[in-house]
């Protein structure tokens, strides 16, 4: 079949590599537009506020689609029912396209009401209107992505996302430059219009790929006619019954952002800031802190995406042991990603801000507070993917909802008292609560105790050791008056090298675990040479 299937770890690394590229392009354009004095933190506030509302509607309308379809399709593919898998795809395309159109129209025509009456920030209206058509294209792309991932083909999923981000980055900068003589809210709307352009391009790419392989797909479908095909109505009910609880987690995540929109802007004004200053302070969180924290989250999302179809297929074949093994391995790698990222951002927050935002370097202290959410959010991503793969689709949403309620209460009480540092703290608390509950639920279902030493303690020891090296290198370079840009880059590179060495020295990854990686044998040879040195 033309739609090629990849192994679990190859699929993970394809998605992971694409996410790294996406974040690189995302960083570039966000840093560029933030450094325009006309845009800066105020523009980021309008941009980020609009995106939070858009993300919420997108979560309700589309977020459960890829995982739902990949789960149902992978179950059919595991037993050879390619005809049933394709009917799931066709039904989903009709159903979710209709839902997306309704939400897009609601956002476009309700933009003024939302911005004035809910957000108390009238300038967000134009951002919401420019984002609304993107919901339709994202929904249709999500159906196609879910179909390909369900067949364990991660390549086209990843290519489409990279293409989308490249186009988004280019057009965002172009539109902002074209609108430099206008107000920050209009520039923010221009930048978000690029999202709609990019989403339509990604959908077109996936559609072309599907049509290119349509003949081969139909040939495979005809070979599986021995299977009974469910009715469209039955499939639609099944899609909705899975999509709603899977979306619930994403909806709650998006709601946590909206909680900040509703509580923080109002709280900052009660704290004593005027509307413009409150927008600037909130813009630091949305436009700087959030995008830096998002890097490790986007890299690790590969495990969440790949685990759902893999576990579903393994369970359909009655192979629970294999599924559990992949979960433990994924959790360990998630720890290896999250811990050094959090510590690195904490130690280098100020030099990183000076490097990336030379024209608007304020806010490093907020990153130092909020960066600890990375640990809990990254690990939680993997936990949610595992729970959904096992069919425990309501649990992630419930865990997140409990954390969101606590976050809302803390924001309402403490933002008017202590200002912009509060949402940074409550974001950490929110993710800690959700992650802890999901962890308990997963291992209770698996009926086994987690190996804390292997999963967390060894990666933590390697991370702490890396932290000492980071401090020493940075202090040394400051002492000999190396400029901040060169200092920061050298320190980050030294930290990465040190971390790899400590992972090898402390035997954080076993040889058989390394061999599961693409080019695992070659990596093992390199690690063995490091041990000898």
Predicted features and spans:
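N-terminal membrane topogenesis motif
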Residues: 1-28, 83, 87, 226-253, ...
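Helix-loop junctions and terminal segments of transmembrane helices
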Residues: 63-78, 297-319
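Membrane-interface junctions at transmembrane-helix termini in multi-pass inner-membrane proteins
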Residues: 138-160, 372-402, 413, 417
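Interfacial segments at transmembrane-helix termini and the short loops linking adjacent helices
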Residues: 112-130, 346-377
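Interfacial/gating helices of multi-pass transporter permease domains
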Residues: 33-56, 184, 188-192, 234-242, ...
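Signature of the first transmembrane helix
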Residues: 7-67, 104, 108, 134-135, ...
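Membrane-interface helix-loop junctions in multi-pass transport and translocation proteins
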Residues: 155, 166-209, 394, 402-439, ...
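Membrane-proximal transmembrane or re-entrant/amphipathic helices at the cytosolic face
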Residues: 472-533
């Amino acid at each position: 079949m033309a739609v090629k299937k990849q192994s679990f770890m190859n699929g993970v690394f394809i998605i992971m590599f694409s996410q790294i590229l996406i974040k690189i392009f995302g960083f570039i354009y966000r840093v560029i537009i933030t450094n325009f004095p006309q845009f800066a933190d105020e523009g980021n506030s309008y941009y980020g506020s609009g995106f939070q509302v858009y993300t919420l509607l997108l979560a309700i309308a589309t977020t459960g689609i890829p995982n739902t379809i990949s789960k149902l399709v992978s179950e059919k593919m595991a037993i050879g029912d390619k005809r049933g898998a394709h009917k799931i795809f066709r039904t989903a395309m009709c159903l979710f396209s209709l839902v997306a159109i309704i939400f897009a129209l609601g956002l476009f025509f309700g933009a003024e009401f939302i911005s004035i009456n809910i957000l108390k920030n009238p300038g967000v209206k134009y951002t919401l209107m420019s984002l609304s058509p993107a919901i339709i294209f994202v929904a249709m792309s999500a159906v196609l992505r879910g179909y390909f991932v369900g067949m364990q083909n991660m390549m086209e999923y990843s290519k489409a996302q990279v293409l989308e981000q490249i186009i988004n980055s280019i057009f965002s900068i172009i539109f902002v430059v074209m609108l430099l003589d206008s107000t920050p809210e209009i520039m923010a709307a221009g930048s978000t219009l690029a999202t709609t352009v990019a989403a339509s391009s990604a959908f077109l790419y996936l559609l072309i790929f599907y049509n290119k392989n349509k003949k081969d797909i139909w040939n495979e479908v005809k070979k599986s006619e021995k299977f009974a095909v469910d009715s469209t109505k039955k499939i639609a009910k099944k899609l909705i019954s899975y999509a709603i609880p899977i979306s619930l987690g994403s909806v709650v995540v998006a709601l946590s952002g909206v909680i900040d929109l509703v509580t923080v802007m109002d709280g900052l004004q009660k704290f004593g800031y005027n509307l413009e200053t409150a927008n600037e302070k909130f813009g630091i969180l949305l436009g700087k802190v959030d995008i830096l924290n998002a890097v490790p989250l986007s890299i690790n999302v590969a495990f969440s995406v790949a685990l759902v179809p893999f576990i579903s297929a393994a369970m359909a074949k009655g192979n629970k042991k294999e599924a559990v093994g992949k979960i433990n391995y994924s959790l360990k790698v998630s720890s290896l990603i999250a811990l050094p990222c959090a510590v690195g951002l904490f130690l280098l927050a100020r030099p990183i801000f000076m490097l990336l935002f030379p024209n608007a370097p304020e806010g490093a202290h907020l990153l130092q507070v909020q960066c600890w959410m990375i640990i809990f959010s990254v690990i939680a991503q993997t936990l949610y993917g595992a729970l959904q793969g096992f069919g425990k689709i309501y649990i992630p949403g419930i865990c997140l909802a409990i954390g969101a309620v606590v976050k809302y209460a803390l924001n309402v009480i403490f933002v008017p008292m202590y200002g912009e540092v509060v949402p940074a703290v409550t974001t950490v608390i929110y993710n800690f609560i959700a992650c802890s509950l999901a962890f308990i639920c997963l291992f209770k279902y698996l009926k086994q105790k987690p190996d804390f030493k292997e999963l967390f303690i060894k990666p933590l020891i390697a991370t702490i050791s890396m932290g000492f090296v980071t401090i020493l290198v940075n202090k040394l370079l400051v002492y000999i008056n190396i400029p901040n840009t060169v200092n920061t880059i050298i320190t980050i590179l030294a930290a990465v090298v040190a971390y790899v060495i400590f992972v090898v020295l402390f035997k954080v990854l076993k040889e058989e675990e390394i061999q599961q990686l693409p080019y695992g044998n070659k990596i093992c040879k390199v690690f063995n040479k490091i041990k000898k040195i």
